[in-house]
Structure formats: structure tokens, C-alpha cells
Amino acid sequence: MEIRIRSVPIAVLMRTPGADRDLIRGFAITEGMVVGPRELSEPIDLGEGRWELGLADGVEIDPEQFRRNLYASSSCGVCGKASIDAVLVSAGTLPTGPRVSHHLLERLPGMMLDHQEGFASTGGLHAAALFDAAGHLRIVREDIGRHNAVDKVVGAVEPWPPGESVLVVSGRVSFEVAQKAAVAGIPIVCGVSAASSLAIDLASRTGLTVVGFVRGDRCVVYTGHDRIEP
């Protein structure tokens, strides 16, 4: 998928087709191009995998500021941020809550899996899901790249902002996943595998709660312990 701003190509995403509009909106938000969906209008399908980012009236973006001479690959998700300092510029203030129990968190990956139709069919898709503080599923999206799945979730959030919510991802909590959660204002991120050292560093500096190895009756809280109840 090629994304353009004012006809200027700014990114090529290697993604699984489906929820394309959510992906474009979420990508624009988590990359700091806009501060939220109110600055966006409907993306325009130009055909042949090319899309124009729709901007609300009065919103001006310099496409050269975000133009990238690289592919965001499905494996690494290099999404235009070269350093933690760059992410901190885009990240806002995270909600102080919610406070959730580790018992609640341990149930969420299984609830997400119940809605992973693509994974059930292929065994090859990652997923991301957004839950409220009570553990109710709000959104689930799938993609070959978990960072794309996160963008699809962010782009589908209604109402905005996400507020006191929990993001769950299949696999590890990478730097890109932590980056996207911080910029979108999602305070808790959980993964079924480990968190990377760079993700933990970013989380510590932004106040993000990162929880890994959420499997069965166990989990590891890396950062933001104050949001997790015993």
C-alpha cells in the first residue's frame, strides 16, 4: 500500500489487505502526522494499492516532512521514528489509569484469539485488540505485521481518544508497538511474549505500562507497575 499526501508518496506499507482505511488513519495518528481523527477525512482510494490521506478542512501537512525513502516491512515495522526522543515529541500525556488486575490481563489474549478469524484460517497473521478497563473487547484487527494491526486498531477507535484502555498484541511488545500506543494515548500494552529493551526504555520515559509473557496464569510487568493490581 502506498500512502500519499497531496499526491506526494510518503510511505509504502507491506500489509495484509483489509481494514485499509483504518490502517491509513491509524498510521497518520501514530506517526504524528495528525493529533487525532478530527484532523482527518475519508481516505481516497486511487486504485492499484495507492491511497491519498484525507485531511479535514483547514488542516495543512507538509508531505516532505514525512516522506520516507524506505519500506515499512512486515517484519520490523520501521515507521519513521529514528529515536526515542523523536517519539517523545509526538507522544501526549497518558491517562493515569486504569488500574487493572493481572488476573484480568491474563484473560485478554484468549479473548482476542477467539476473534482472530484470519489466524484461525492461515496461522500466519498477528493481531491487536483494544479492551476497556473492565475487560470488554472494543476492537480487534489482524495483519501480517503486528505494527500494522495496531495501526488498524487505532484507526478504528470510536469515540476518540482511547482513554483508559488496554492494548493487547500477539507476540512481543516491540519498540514500534510501544511507540504507537504512546502516541495514541493508550496507557497499557500487553504482549504474549517478551518486550524489547528499546520498548521498555520508551515506556519508562513516557509513563506507559508494558506487560509481557501474558500466558495462562502468569505475566511479567516491565514498567508502569502502579496500573497493575496484585
PLM region descriptions:
Residues H147-Y222, R227-P230:
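Feature captures the catalytic cores and cofactor-binding loops of soluble hydro-lyases/lyases
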Residues M1-A128, D132-A133, L137-I139, I144:
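Intrinsically disordered, low-complexity regions enriched in acidic/Ser/Thr/Pro/Gln residues
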